[in-house]
Amino acid sequence: PVMNLELEQAHLLALLGLGGDQPATYRFQGAPGDQALQMLHDRLDQPLSEPMQALCDALSWLRDHTTLVPVGMCIGPFSLMTKLVSDPITPIALAGMGLSAAEDEGIAAVTDNLALAVAVITRYVEAQAAAGARAIVLCEPAANVVYLSPKQIEQGSGIFDTFVMEPLLRVKHALMGADADLILHDCGELTDGMVASLASLDPAVLSLGSSRVLWEDARLVPNTTVLFGNLPSKRFFSDAEITVEQVEDMGAELLARMRQVGHPFVLGSECDVLSVPGCEH
């Protein structure tokens, strides 16, 4: 599938009559509240946006005319929430200190936007599965140590479970109900505990960023989950950052190390390969 993680945000806002012609820059001022949540649920059965429907149509064509395995794509709930809130970091930190949504409007905004995100993402992945997707690539790059304090988590805070895992579980259950596998991608910087938590979702494939050492992460991930990655594609834009020879050496080492630990593995990039406009010329 084409990687466009702005589709869900645009569709969500359109269903609520918000965002205008620049949905990518729209941010809620305060918590959307129960009225917005109810409005979204009432309108979820409306047709998907044209780009979302086009992806579903492509999946159906693959199912009906090829022997390829159709795979869909969507953004993760936490990552979508961070695109809807002006400052998600402070409320999450306050929640990590023990405050609740009833005590802080910022936490309420994060909580409400997560609920909106789960609703529209669940609708989208179910539509993709109905169109023929056998698996969904769910991209959750914002679930990382920038947004979620490792120190707070180490001290017993449940912020990773509350804001990342619980929404992901709801999407995972929707995929299970639709008989579609989860391919989970998170290229953010993660702790061992975060990796283990993500692996507990039992994804068919877990794709991680180049900050992780995959042959060490193999001990955190069940053998039923294929590890994917994690060549540093964010540095591929310039030979001054990394050369072709260095990438080849990294790939060879990854293959050798993963064979040694015996974990199912697919060599690939940590994320999408950045494109420089005009490079095709």
Model-derived regions: residue spans:
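Glycine-rich, proline-tolerant flexible connector loops at the mouths of alpha/beta enzymes
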Residues: 1-31, 41-48, 135-158, 269-270, ...
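Short beta-strand segments at enzyme active-site cores
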Residues: 1-3, 70-73, 131-140, 181-187, ...
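Short glycine-enriched loops at secondary-structure junctions
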Residues: 4-6, 28-29, 74-89, 134, ...
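Active-site-proximal, glycine-rich beta->alpha crossover segments in alpha/beta enzymes
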Residues: 18-127, 155-159
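Alpha/beta enzyme core
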Residues: 95-108, 112-144, 154-155, 161, ...
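Catalytic-face loop-and-helix region of soluble metabolic enzyme cores
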Residues: 173-281
